[in-house]
Amino acid sequence: MLKTALALGLAAIAAVSTTSLPATANDAAGTYKLDRAHASLVWKVNHLGLSFYTARFDTFDATLDINPDEPQSAKLEVTVDPTSIRTGFPFSDAKDFDKELVQSPNFFNAKEHPEIKFVSTSIERTGDKTAKVTGDLTLLGVTKPVTLDVTLNGQMAHPMKKKPALGFSGVGKIKRSEFGMTHLVGGVGDEVELLLEAEFIKE
């Protein structure tokens, strides 16, 4: 469930960045890499109908290829390391909950599925700085189409890198059962909310 977040969120940048980047097309076009120091991937899932349990992935990467003259041809590829999950479980002396989620066949089963991947397939602009990005998400060996709502927060020449930079927020929802993660559905929600914040810098 968490893995999805990452892939989805990053995909969104493709949509808005290609339609909202600065007017200098020659400068804006090209390949952008995720600034991992300024990115976060968080997921939320309902717990017993009482609250939303939150966690994150610490290790993920993404590449965005864009051409302002052909925004619909933008391509985003994202990879997530499922072993980088962090739940903040407070009783680590009792058990390693993160490791349990990573290794268990009921959840991420990272030994059999060491990577989560997203590849964008289409972009639909919904506003000056918003878009819906659809792509193929592969999780637990299952590939399904997913869509993320993305907002371009801003773009500029990075003050330190001296290169074009983009910043965005992405939100989306998936059903983990559709990817085969059905364990404890009922007590732990099937629907997973994804929250992404990210900056991209042109290579």
Located regions from the model:
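Bacterial N-terminal signal peptides that target proteins for export
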Residues: 1-9
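C-terminal segment of classical bacterial N-terminal signal peptides
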Residues: 14-22
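Low-complexity, acidic/polar, glycine-enriched regions of mature
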Residues: 21-203
